[in-house]
Amino acid sequence: MAKRYWNINLEEMMEAGVHFGHGTRKWNPRMAPYISAKRKGIHITNLTRTARFLSEACDLVFDAASRGKQFLIVGTKNKAADSVARAAIRARCHYVNKKWLGGMLTNWSTTETRLHKFRDLRTEQKTGRLNRLPKRDAAVLKRQLSHLQTYLGGIKYMTGLPDIVIIIDQQEEYTALRECITLGIPTISLIDTNCDPDLADISIPANDDAIASIRLILNKLVFAICEGHSSYIQNS
């Protein structure tokens, strides 16, 4: 896999607060190699290491996208949800940004059944068939459609398991991460100072609480995916 230049700038990362970790009492000792200092009771992440792993992740997603691979971005906490959806849509990736339904990947046949139901209901709504049903029946189906849109809207075009999963908050999305590990799906994960760096295939030490930090990391990864997609289209 060739190394590329992704314009990862330490000053830009500092401005986004990527280096701010959690309080020193709330940390995982396995993160010690990724921490450069303590300041006013919080750990400071070593941004040189962040840049290195972010660059590796960009190389990986570029290479995968240039071969037509499929991505899933997972980030369900409120402050990350909009950024996750925007980034995923921009890069034509699947995404989950509301709630991870247990077994979404490990019990794929059930997820697939739900997706078929979702597609059928969307078709019925578009054709106006829902409005021709008795009011009570229509109301029940519209509630179902709304529920499915909330939780499966970001994966409505997913036809199989993703090739790579990008996780925005390791602790928040631990169930999703465990499912990927069980299935052998490669993962890229943001890891704050309270996380375990050994769980994901590529762990990017970064502030997973600040919106600016999350956006910066997502923007770099999404740019690499888009570049990979362009390469794939040109070579097809």
UniProtKB/Swiss-Prot annotation:
The keyword Zinc-finger does not apply. GO terms for biological process: translation. InterPro entries: Ribosomal_uS2, Ribosomal_uS2_bac/mit/plastid, Ribosomal_uS2_CS, Ribosomal_uS2_flav_dom_sf. The keyword Plastid applies. It is found in: Plastid, Chloroplast. It comes from the Eukaryota. GO terms for cellular component: chloroplast; mitochondrial small ribosomal subunit. Belongs to the universal ribosomal protein uS2 family. This is Small ribosomal subunit protein uS2c. It comes from Carica papaya. The gene is rps2.
